[in-house]
Amino acid sequence: MAETLSGLGDSGAAGAAALSSASSETGTRRLSDLRVIDLRAELRKRNVDSSGNKSVLMERLKKAIEDEGGNPDEIEITSEGNKKTSKRSSKGRKPEEEGVEDNGLEENSGDGQEDVETSLENLQDIDIMDISVLDEAEIDNGSVADCVEDDDADNLQESLSDSRELVEGEMKELPEQLQEHAIEDKETINNLDTSSSDFTILQEIEEPSLEPENEKILDILGETCKSEPVKEESSELEQPFAQDTSSVGPDRKLAEEEDLFDSAHPEEGDLDLASESTAHAQSSKADSLLAVVKREPAEQPGDGERTDCEPVGLEPAVEQSSAASELAEASSEELAEAPTEAPSPEARDSKEDGRKFDFDACNEVPPAPKESSTSEGADQKMSSPEDDSDTKRLSKEEKGRSSCGRNFWVSGLSSTTRATDLKNLFSKYGKVVGAKVVTNARSPGARCYGFVTMSTAEEATKCINHLHKTELHGKMISVEKAKNEPVGKKTSDKRDSDGKKEKSSNSDRSANLKRDDKCDRKDDAKKGDDGSGEKSKDQDDQKPGPSERSRATKSGSRGTERTVVMDKSKGVPVISVKTSGSKERASKSLDRKSASREKRSVVSFDKVKEPRKSRDSESHRVRERSEREQRMQAQWEREERERLEIARERLAFQRQRLERERMERERLERERMHVEHERRREQERIHREREELRRQQELRYEQERRPAVRRPYDLDRRDDAYWPEAKRAALDERYHSDFNRQDRFHDFDHRDRGRYPDHSVDRREGSRSMMGEREGQHYPERHGGPERHGRDSRDGWGGYGSDKRMSEGRGLPPPPRRDWGDHGRREDDRAWQGTADGGMMDRDHKRWQGGERSMSGHSGPGHMMNRGGMSGRGSFAPGGASRGHPIPHGGMQGGFGGQSRGSRPSDARFTRRY
């Protein structure tokens, strides 16, 4: 089996010539014809690194041969050594592969990478890799499992001894007719012990009894091949860096895979199909035999496996072959139950082609070690065809029964669960032969399932009873027995996803292919003697399929046909030997499988696409909805911005309008204030002018009334105390008389002016007196009382003093005090009756003060205009009239100036001049 696996990954054209004569003869082969196993063996002989893919190995070997001085194109290879090295290399790589599979995707070994690359090349045309083994725990029950290096000869010997013991025990149970073959197989096992490190025993076994044994082993290999590829392919799918199937540890894997196949596990079936096609396409049957031999030691250490591992030795191979035939039968039944699920035709064709080519090589190409052993096996099989078929059936039934109940599925695993976890968990209730964690390679993210094989059905039942519905790594796991009946149905129960169908179909396909392989091998062995391969093949095409297996097993050598076919995956010629029954059955099953396979693949593809489409449509709807919402949001924001802008503009316009109105109001208020101010100022001016005019009129009137007395007379009267009674009567009469009388000055005699001396009046003092009076008039509230009092007293006393002096000097009678004071008070009252604004009066006062300096005589009690007001003795100065005050001219033009001068002494400030 290991050889089969190695052939799957590694054998090229050299696969056809893999079987050489059993003798350890040396033959020259081209470097390009060497398989990876051979390349590695040659490299190990030369102590050169044997890791890497085929191209790297070829380059390394070529360089090593050139260094030795040899011809790299013609390499001498000892057939025995070749076979041994191939086996050993496969065995040596098995631990590596085990390590890779144990760790799942966690580890990548260099050898695994090369082997995976080669195996992937072989599998590139096969699309039936539905099941991928995520993780596989190789059971360390046997020493073979413990072998991590190629040189663990001790472990191999132990395993071989175990296998020998097993074979002996089985021999006792086998029919006597098989005893001969068993003995021969025993000898073969002894040979295996002697050369345990190399596993080249198959080539050394040349007894005729080997033929039937080889045939049976090939049949078993068909099964194991299929089951092992399950592992292998899964590892390839899951771990691109895993080693090639050829490098897969054949011993342990084969044991596990066989068990898995016995349980007709759908997942294995899937994997089996994929790897099986490649294995058969590229490996010879001798490889298969070798693999079986290797594998049996592996399985035997696994206690419970021994029944399944009967083919361990070539003798066990006899029993195993019968078991394989039975397995093929079971697989055919399974196939019938799950007809919809069929393996890809390519896989089977390649497998059949591989068989044909191998057997042709066995019969026709003696130089290859594989071929020689195969031909020998064919001869042996011819010797006892019917016995072989019977023994096959028996062993297969026993094996099926024994392995049927030992396998169980573990579903609901956590994504972190590894095969070693399962092994540790179930080892509490018995010996765990194999444990795998598999998933559906077609649907990423599919759930993981565990497939566990116990050593006995009782232990499996115990595990199911104790561990069903228990918790592992935080997940509830369910443990269910793996049934042989409908493989596809079991997987469907296990999985709701497409992976179920694919797995079951793969298992069916693998079963059918294995059965076909068995029948083909048997028939080939029988036909090897007859040599009528082609005819039987034609007949086989015409035969129906249901009873083909039994018919094929019975008609041992009668209906085989050898056909050389080009392997599709590698383009290598492969010899396929088929019996008529096996071929037709294979063709029918292949058609059925291919149809179901296509159907399933289509369905699975549609199913895979449906959720994707729904997700895409949902995401598209969500995206459209979000875009629509974004557009609506953007539109709403835009409208909102426009509304806000309009509102802002309206507010700004209203603010501007209010500002304009406010400014207009302020302007109107200013104008009103200005007009009011002008009006008040005009009123004040009019008041002042009227007051001045009145004062002047009073002065004139008084001077008119005053008798034109000579100065001596005045001087005489000076002692009369100002004629109080007479003066008072006159003043009373005057002040109470009508002031509006326009002719009151007409009787004034201008000639009297000459009597009064002209007093030169200081302009500044006159204006100062005017200022003083005006200040008194303009601030009645603040100092009206004191000012009036001062003015009254000044006027009175000034008049008194001046009159007194005048009377003293000139005889003028002093004017009475009272009338001037009273008149000043009355005039003050009259002048400021309408005044309201003190500040404005102050300003106006100042303005009048500066601007009316030309009328210096307006505000004093007796001051007349000093500047330009009088022209000589002419009429009243135009300064007064120019301001719009009507002043009578008639009668005044004589002594007006003198009159004013005469009255000026009434001011106290001028008394010092006299």
From Swiss-Prot:
Q: Which UniProt keywords apply?
A: Acetylation, DNA-binding, Isopeptide bond, Methylation, Nucleus, Phosphoprotein, Repressor, RNA-binding, Transcription, Transcription regulation, Ubl conjugation
Q: Tell me the InterPro entries matching this sequence.
A: Nucleotide-bd_a/b_plait_sf, RBD_domain_sf, RRM_dom, SAF_Modulators, SAFB1_2_RBD, SAP_dom, SAP_dom_sf
Give all residue intervals belonging to the SAP domain. Answer: 31-65
Return the motif ranges for Nuclear localization signal: 599-616
Where found, per UniProt?
Nucleus
Entry-linked Pfam families: RRM_1, SAP
* Coiled-coil portions: none
Where would I find the Glycyl lysine isopeptide (Lys-Gly) (interchain with G-Cter in SUMO1) crosslink on this chain? 578
Query: N6-acetyllysine: which positions carry it?
Result: 607
**Modification Asymmetric dimethylarginine, positions:** 867, 873, 883
Where in this protein does the record say Phosphoserine is found? 24, 55, 79, 195, 197, 209, 383-384, 415, 580, 582, 601, 604
Glycyl lysine isopeptide (Lys-Gly) (interchain with G-Cter in SUMO) crosslink location in chain: 231, 294
Stretches assigned to the RRM domain: 406-484
In this UniProt entry, the residues modified to N-acetylalanine are: 2
Q: Where is this cross-link: Glycyl lysine isopeptide (Lys-Gly) (interchain with G-Cter in SUMO2)?
A: 172, 186, 381, 392, 483, 514, 543, 570, 578, 846
Tell me a GO biological process for this protein: estrogen receptor signaling pathway
Q: Where is this region: Interaction with POLR2A?
A: 528-791
User: Which cystines does this chain contain?
Assistant: none
Which residue ranges have biased composition labelled Acidic residues?
Answer: 67-77, 98-117
This protein's assembly is summarised as: Monomer and homodimer. Interacts with KHDRBS3. Interacts with CLK2. Interacts with POLR2A, ASF/SRSF1, SRp30c/SRFS9 and TRA2B/SFRS10. Interacts with SRPK1 and inhibits its activity. Interacts with RBMX. Interacts with FUS. Interacts with ZBED4.
Q: Which PANTHER family match?
A: SCAFFOLD ATTACHMENT FACTOR B-RELATED (PTHR15683), SCAFFOLD ATTACHMENT FACTOR B1 (PTHR15683:SF6)
Protein name, per record: Scaffold attachment factor B1
Annotated gene: SAFB
